[in-house]
Curated annotation (Swiss-Prot):
InterPro entries: MetI-like, MetI-like_sf, UgpAE/MalFG_permease
Listed name of the protein: Inner membrane ABC transporter permease protein YcjO
UniProt topological domain (Periplasmic) ranges: 1-12, 99-110, 157-162, 236-261
Membrane topology term: Multi-pass membrane protein
GO biological process: transmembrane transport
Keywords: Cell inner membrane, Cell membrane, Membrane, Transmembrane, Transmembrane helix, Transport
Cleavable signal peptide: none
Ranges in the topological domain labelled Cytoplasmic: 34-77, 132-135, 184-214, 283-293
Stretches that traverse the bilayer: 13-33, 78-98, 111-131, 136-156, 163-183, 215-235, 262-282
SUPFAM superfamilies for the chain: MetI-like (SSF161098)
Domain of life, source organism: Bacteria
Function, as annotated: Probably part of the binding-protein-dependent transport system YcjNOP. Probably responsible for the translocation of the substrate across the membrane.
Length: 293
C-alpha cells in the first residue's frame, strides 16, 4: 500500500475513503435540507396529483405576521433557557457530590443516568400516570393525604401547570448528560489545588470559584451550547406529555399535519435553523469549543 501511493498525493485516496460517508451525509442531510428550503417557497398540497404552486416568500411573511409563531418562539426561548439552566446546575451539583469516594458509588451513578438512557415514551407514561387526576400518586398525596387542595388539578390540561411540568420533566430527563460531562472533568482536577486553597483560608464557595470553575469552563460551554441546540429542536417529549405547550417543534408539527400547511411548516423549520445557526456562531465567538478562549 505504501509503494502504491509512494510519491503521490494522499488526497485522492482520502477522498475515496470518505466517499461513502459523504454520499450518506449528502443523502440524509444535504438533500433533505435543500428540499425543505424549496418547499418553503411553495404551496404544496397533500394530494400528489395536484401540482404545487410557487408563492415566493409568502410563507415567510405569513410566519412573521402570525401571533401564534411569536408565541411559540417565546415559549421555546423560555423552555430552552429554564431547561438548560436547570439541567446544567443540577448536573454540576450531582457531579460534585459524586466526585468523592463512598460505598456503592458505581451503583448510585448508574441510577442517576437511568432517566437519560430510558426511552422517552416510558418516562412520559410514568409522569402522566403520576399526575393523573383520577389515580395519580401526586393527586393522592395532595388531595387525600395532605389535603393541600380540595379537587385534583388537571395538571396536563392547564397551560400554566403543563409548562412547569414539561420543564421539570426535561430537567430531570436530561441532567445526566451534564452530570457525566462534569464528573469526567472534575476527576482530572488535582486535589492538591483544593488543599492549597483551603490552607490559604478559602471557603467552599471560593474554592469552587477559584479552582473548579476555571477548570470546567470549556466543558460548561460545550454542555450549554449542545443542550441549547437540542432543546430548541425539542418535539417528542413535549408533544407526548401535553397538547397545551406549543413550543416551535409542536407548532411546526401542527402546522404541517393538523392544518396541512406544508409550505408554512417548511418555512418555520428554515427560520428555526437560522436561529440555531446564529446561536452557534455567537457562542463560538465567546468560547472555543475545544477549550481555548
Amino acid at each position: 500500500m505504501n509503494r502504491l501511493f509512494s510519491g503521490r498525493s494522499d488526497m485522492p485516496f482520502a477522498l475515496l475513503l470518505l466517499a461513502p460517508s459523504l454520499l450518506l451525509l449528502g443523502g440524509l442531510v444535504a438533500w433533505p435540507m435543500v428540499s425543505n428550503i424549496e418547499i418553503s417557497f411553495l404551496r404544496l398540497p397533500l394530494n400528489p396529483n395536484i401540482e404545487s404552486t410557487f408563492v415566493g416568500v409568502s410563507n415567510y411573511v405569513r410566519i412573521l405576521s402570525d401571533p401564534g409563531f411569536w408565541h411559540s418562539l417565546w415559549m421555546t426561548v423560555w423552555y430552552t433557557a429554564l431547561v438548560v439552566a436547570g439541567s446544567t446546575v443540577l448536573g454540576l451539583a450531582v457531579a460534585m457530590f459524586f466526585n468523592r469516594e463512598f460505598r456503592l458509588r458505581k451503583t448510585a451513578r448508574s441510577l442517576v443516568i437511568l432517566s437519560y438512557v430510558t426511552p422517552s415514551i416510558s418516562l412520559v407514561f410514568a409522569w402522566k400516570y403520576m399526575f393523573n387526576n383520577g389515580y395519580g400518586i401526586v393527586n393522592y398525596l395532595g388531595v387525600d393525604l395532605l389535603h393541600l387542595y380540595e379537587q385534583a388539578p388537571l395538571w396536563f390540561d392547564n397551560p400554566g401547570s403543563s409548562f412547569v411540568l414539561v420543564v421539570l420533566f426535561a430537567i430531570w430527563r436530561y441532567f445526566p448528560y451534564a452530570f457525566i460531562s462534569f464528573l469526567a472533568i472534575l476527576q482530572t482536577i488535582d486535589k492538591s489545588l483544593y488543599e492549597a486553597a483551603e490552607m490559604d483560608g478559602a471557603n467552599a464557595w471560593q474554592r469552587f470559584r477559584i479552582v473548579t470553575l476555571p477548570a470546567i469552563m470549556p466543558v460548561l460551554a460545550t454542555v450549554v451550547t449542545l443542550r441549547t441546540i437540542w432543546m430548541f429542536y425539542m418535539f417528542a417529549d413535549v408533544y407526548l406529555l401535553t397538547t397545551k405547550v406549543d413550543i416551535l417543534g409542536v407548532y411546526l408539527y401542527k402546522t404541517a399535519f393538523a392544518f396541512n400547511d406544508l409550505g408554512k411548516a417548511a418555512a418555520i423549520s428554515v427560520v428555526l435553523f437560522i436561529i440555531i445557526f446564529a446561536v452557534i456562531l455567537l457562542t463560538r465567538k465567546r468560547v472555543n469549543l475545544n477549550g481555548n478562549k
